[in-house]
């Protein structure tokens, strides 16, 4: 009930007004069956735009803190993430990564759409950074196709460090889905992930940085 209400009534019209999204390649998203949407990450609002434009229900993994926060803000977060169907993941323990992959696998086993930003966090400067291997580990284990998605303009609508949304021009491009056969060696998963991230960089016209975004700026200097 709440998911379509947010999408078509409460948030959708505002997102369209602010970002005037231009969508390309949406037919590349399978109409049925499990699918992984792998997108670059520029702004917090990226997930809302993906949910807005994809005709199927999209599920993200959300950190458990969003469901256990205190005070008014905590209650609002808990309500929003619960009614929108997001899945809580405990990221504090040693098995945090395994818990996330298990949750993603369950979404796909139910024939759902799992959306993920392989970079793991927002790009600090608009470039595309090295991806975590979990996305393709799940793809290889489940056989679900991966749709590469490039996003641009959301960092203007939702600038880093600002609580105010602004007008901008959002563009979202969906590439052709591809399947990844199981890998026998860990380095094969790493290589496939690097290839995916380089493709996202090339499609978006942005530079690829072979470091994790979380290490910026300690390990990576600006161009």
PLM regions and their residue ranges:
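Catalytic core of membrane glycerolipid acyltransferases/transacylases, capturing the structured
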Residues: 31-94
């Amino acid at each position: 009930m709440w998911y379509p209400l947010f999408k078509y009534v409460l948030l959708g019209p505002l997102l369209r007004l602010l970002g005037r999204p231009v969508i390309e390649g949406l037919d590349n998203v399978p109409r049925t069956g499990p699918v992984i949407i792998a997108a670059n990450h520029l702004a917090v609002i990226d997930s809302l735009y993906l949910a807005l434009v994809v005709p199927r229900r999209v599920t993200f993994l959300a950190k458990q803190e969003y469901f256990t926060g205190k005070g008014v803000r905590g209650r609002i977060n808990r309500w929003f993430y619960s009614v929108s169907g997001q899945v809580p993941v405990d990221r504090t323990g040693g098995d945090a990564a395994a818990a996330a992959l298990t949750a993603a696998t369950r979404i796909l086993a139910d024939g759902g759409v799992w959306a993920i930003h392989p970079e793991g966090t927002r790009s600090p400067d608009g470039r595309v950074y090295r991806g975590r291997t979990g996305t393709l580990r799940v793809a290889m284990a489940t056989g679900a196709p991966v749709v590469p998605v490039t996003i641009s303009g959301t960092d203007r609508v939702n600038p880093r460090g600002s609580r105010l949304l602004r007008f901008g021009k959002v563009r979202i491009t969906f590439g052709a889905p591809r399947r990844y056969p199981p890998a026998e060696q860990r380095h094969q998963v790493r290589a496939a992930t690097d290839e995916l991230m380089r493709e996202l960089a090339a499609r978006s016209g942005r530079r690829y940085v072979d470091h994790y975004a979380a290490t910026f700026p300690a390990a990576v200097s600006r161009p």
